[in-house]
């Protein structure tokens, strides 16, 4: 009998699906998002979720850790997992949600909806001036994984000219009009009305957006980061 520790916010219908898929060979502990303890983690053969590193303690009993996040950087550090433990993540599971969130943020900024929302709360009739449109805008998507491609498809369908940047050369997907590698980033940044970044937490992406790169952007460019926060050198934002 395998013990499965579920740290996900599941409903009864989810539990039924999990138990049906696992069969009689597994027993489940449903602890919720914040219910991981040293005791239930140590008892688990399989964990679904993202337990605190200190609780795992390189457990020899743990056979599989299925993260409910795409990022797995902290779990691959030496000493976190036992050598036999398999680690899987949720890459691709959030592409629609994150891309649509990024699109919503873009439209909010282009149409100054945050200003009008605040004015509405103050019961003020205000005019905040010129707004911009996604139609005919040049949108630079830095990182063409699942999220980047989904976002590119959204803005392209609405009339944007989409430039994609990725790490390695490859065939141009239909969701972009132009495709470049990261070595060309500085060449295309000045062209963008919108920069949408969705980079992973890798050493190469850490502090990629320096003061010098922000200076390359148009003064009125919109920058949206839906990837790892470490891609931006935070001190240059203030």
Show which residues each predicted segment covers.
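N-terminal Rossmann-fold NAD(P) dinucleotide-binding loop
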Residues: 148-149
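Phosphate-binding beta-alpha-beta segment of Rossmann-like dinucleotide-binding domains, i.e.
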Residues: 83-138
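Rossmann-like adenosine-cofactor binding region
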Residues: 169-238
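An N-terminal-biased, well-structured beta-alpha scaffold segment characteristic
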Residues: 1-86, 210
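Glycine-rich Rossmann-fold phosphate-binding loop(s) that bind the pyrophosphate
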Residues: 144-145
């Amino acid at each position: 009998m395998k013990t499965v520790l579920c740290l996900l916010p599941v409903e009864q219908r989810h539990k039924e699906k999990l138990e049906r898929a696992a069969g009689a060979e597994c027993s489940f502990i449903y602890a919720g998002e914040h219910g991981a303890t040293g005791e239930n983690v140590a008892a688990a053969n399989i964990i679904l979720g993202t337990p605190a590193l200190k609780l795992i303690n390189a457990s020899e009993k743990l056979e599989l850790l299925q993260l409910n996040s795409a990022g797995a950087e902290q779990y691959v550090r030496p000493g976190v997992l036992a050598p036999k433990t398999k680690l899987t993540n949720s890459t691709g599971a959030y592409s629609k949600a994150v891309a649509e969130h990024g699109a919503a943020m873009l439209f909010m900024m282009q149409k100054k909806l945050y200003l009008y929302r605040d004015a509405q709360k103050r019961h003020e009739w205000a005019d905040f001036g010129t707004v911009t449109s996604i139609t005919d805008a040049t949108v630079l998507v830095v990182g063409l994984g699942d999220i980047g491609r989904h976002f590119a498809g959204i803005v392209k369908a609405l009339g944007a000219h989409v430039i994609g940047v990725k790490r390695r050369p490859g065939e141009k997907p239909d969701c972009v009009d132009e495709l470049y590698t990261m070595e060309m980033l500085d060449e295309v940044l000045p062209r963008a009305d919108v920069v949408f970044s969705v980079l992973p937490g890798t050493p190469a992406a850490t502090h990629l957006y320096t003061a010098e790169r922000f200076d390359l952007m148009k003064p009125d460019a919109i920058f949206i980061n839906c990837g790892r926060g470490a891609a931006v050198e935070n001190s240059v934002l203030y």
